[in-house]
Amino acid sequence: MGCAPAAHYLPGGGWRRLLVVVVALVVLDRAGARVRAADDDTGGLSRAAFPKGFVFGTATSAFQVEGMAASGGRGPSIWDPFVHTPGNIAGNGNADVTTDEYHRYKEDVDLLKSLNFDAYRFSISWSRIFPDGEGKVNTEGVAYYNNLIDYVIKQGLIPYVNLNHYDLPLALQKKYEGWLSPKIVGVFSDYAEFCFKTYGDRVKNWFTFNEPRIVAALGHDTGTDPPNRCTKCAAGGNSATEPYIVAHNIILSHATAVDRYRNKFQASQKGKIGIVLDFNWYEPLTNSTEDQAAAQRARDFHVGWFLDPLINGQYPKNMRDIVKERLPTFTPEQAKLVKGSADYFGINQYTANYMADQPAPQQAATSYSSDWHVSFIFQRNGVPIGQQANSNWLYIVPTGMYGAVNYIKEKYNNPTIIISENGMDQSGNLTREEFLHDTERIEFYKNYLTELKKAIDDGANVVAYFAWSLLDNFEWLSGYTSKFGIVYVDFTTLKRYPKDSANWFKNMLQASGPGSKSGSGTSDSQVGSATSASHPVGSAISSSHRLLLPLLVSLHFLFPSFFMFLSL
């Protein structure tokens, strides 16, 4: 007789109520499926798509996430008074508390592990170790980083430690004029040596500096960042000379610190050391000889400023020809020290620009930025180079990843590269739900990683990739109006909520294959906690609806009154 008569055995019109339940479950399941679809579509990417042993991680920096800015024995950095000056930071934000990782580092490391990442790249606050930049050691600060490093390792993750991420101790700026003085070379090297001696038994991956070009250019050419020096700045400065002096002293500081590491620690500690450089890809606006030359000048003045001396022992020819006597020179001894002073290079890659030739105007003030003799162009024939993210400088151009990595491979004899930062930001004015469902960020990572894979397949020696950033945090001049994290932070409660992009990484990285490491997966409870934070209803329905439907039918037979409320 078939199954239709079964309806007659459901008491009190229960069939209609059961139908309501079934429809509700289907609707919820489809909603969850739509959410999961974005998370689960890895675009063909997996661990197996990358070389065996390839490392995936996320990155942060001390000033941006730690908090405890005036506590725990930490001395001020050059950024501390700057962020407390009204009008300097969007929304007048500051980093006094930020994400409070100082107290919540275990929670963040656990979260990182639950998302199937392999490594955590973070920086040490120089003034938390040496409040005055030199001299007396702050034992509380030393203990904090010991605890952080130990916990990262305990959780099966790899620490990648950066010694300086913009936050020069304020005392050194006042005493020596910061990076303008050659005296700081020895001071930084002493700090670095202390860190090698204290943490190097566990830390096997070091970086000396993060984006020294930013320190030189924004701190001493435009003057927008601390110490806010430029030709027309109230603090004084010379945009034609100081950026080059600062970069020169940072390069010597890096090389001297590396020399100490190699001579005193590397053999016994068996670690490696490098430097992090930013590199926007520069594409000529047209095929003209002039625009192609402009694009090459931009590459030389941007990343070549550091890669050329660190690999070849001298500055790029374009810089020597244009800057002339304003460009410092290395002595033979310094050139020998600098050349080859990196085991790998961290590359922060975000965006790309078109470059057009622009002869220097006769009356233009001489500066580092004017020395490029280029125009930055963001569209060609009315078509933008890419979709703009929240930041006005960040155009989403995935092919720029391939261009940057392949360029370094071809020009610099294929050095070992770590993609040390890559990401995009959202506006800080969204709702929590809008933050969590960050499909644009998923597409960003999918497309940029696809281009990175192409570069690796074409022979680029890239060994690791770090997303910027684990957490929404204090984004320098943008304060809290710019959100780069794959994890949303409620800055009222400081509670963390993994975004869809975090779950996308979790799904992509849990795939087994030649690139995976043993034990890299997560337990069911870890996966569940990470997923449900973003979309609890969808994830719960997706995993249990096949069990719920038969259960509900049985309940209708046994306890018809249980569902009576559904008919109201």
UniProtKB/Swiss-Prot annotation:
GO terms of molecular function: beta-D-fucosidase activity; beta-galactosidase activity; beta-gentiobiose beta-glucosidase activity; beta-glucosidase activity; beta-L-arabinosidase activity; beta-mannosidase activity; cellobiose glucosidase activity; glucan exo-1,3-beta-glucosidase activity
Enzyme class: hydrolase
InterPro entries per record: Glyco_hydro_1, Glycoside_hydrolase_SF
Active site, per annotation: 211, 421
Keyword Hydrolase listed: yes
Reactions accelerated catalytically: Hydrolysis of terminal, non-reducing beta-D-glucosyl residues with release of beta-D-glucose
One GO BP annotation of this record: carbohydrate metabolic process
Pfam families (alphabetical): Glyco_hydro_1
Keyword Hydrolase tagged: yes
Assigned keywords, A-Z: Disulfide bond, Glycoprotein, Glycosidase, Hydrolase, Signal
Disulfide bonds: 230-233
Residues bearing attached sugar chains per UniProt: 287, 429
Enzyme Commission number(s) from the entry: 3.2.1.21
Protein name in the entry: Beta-glucosidase 8
